Amino acid sequence: MIKAFSSEVDPGSREESASKKQPAAAEITEDGFLGGQLRLRQPKSGHRAGHDAILLAAATPARSGDRVVDLGSGVGAAGLAVARRVRGIDLVLVEIDPDLAELARNNAAANAIKAEVVILDVEAGAAAFDDAGLAPDSADVVLMNPPFNDPSRHRASPDGVRQRAHVATATTLAAWVHVARRILRSNGQLALIWRADGIAEVLAALDRGFGSLEILPVHGDATAPAIRILVRAVKGGRAPTRLHAALLLNEESGVPNKWVQEVLAGKGELPLARR
């Protein structure tokens, strides 16, 4: 069994948190998100947070007082972005890599966001989640950005961490959705992002235990196929599936879409976030 390590970040412990062991400074960058409202330290190479994490956060239907669990949080980008938009959530960041988890812990403290950081493999099993305080029916909202690149079409990176963060196995999505179903309360909310050409995999994974799906396709522009899908699902939901109008990252002229820019700057949310 994989032993989980959990630590709670107090927003007042910035100096102590900053002194914790991290990768060498030369290997780390500090980047601004949400128009500078969120500052994140992350590895210069390997898996780096970007637009996917912020779009996922903007699609997450969290409310003040909710227990929100970010599975595979990396350095905390998506979960911390949710906490910046929705004050008063009880945030848990779950990450398998100890170095990324430590960066997530420090990022939470540096941004004065209270968060619990758990070092745990999402596919570790129910007992490990119980040990980490993530028992069945204990979360109101789960968000996830699982590894989603198809290994048959994606050249594996020599960087093991990068490969694990980006390349899915045949069971990755189903396993992560199973975890979300177990830890969510009845009528709990799941938000996820996946590659658009894998929509059939998403629908199959959500077929058991989830309903009331809302799907938002993300396109580079109006002339291109969707590159991502953002999906919201409800544990035990029974409402019909809704397909939203496409989210265009760029106008036909190549100019960035103003609404998307507002969302990325932390000035708005996506329709899936409303409940």
Which residue ranges define each predicted feature?
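A short acidic, Gly/Pro-enriched loop at the edge of an enzyme's catalytic core
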Residues: 128-141
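Mobile active-site "lid"/loop adjacent to the S-adenosyl-L-methionine
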Residues: 146-175
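Conserved Class I SAM-dependent methyltransferase catalytic core
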Residues: 45, 49, 170-226
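Conserved class I S-adenosyl-L-methionine
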Residues: 65-74
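Class I SAM-dependent transferase core
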Residues: 25-63
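Conserved SAM-binding loop
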Residues: 104-105
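Conserved SAM-binding loop of SAM-dependent methyltransferases across substrates and taxa
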Residues: 75-88
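SAM/dcSAM-binding transferase cores
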Residues: 225-275
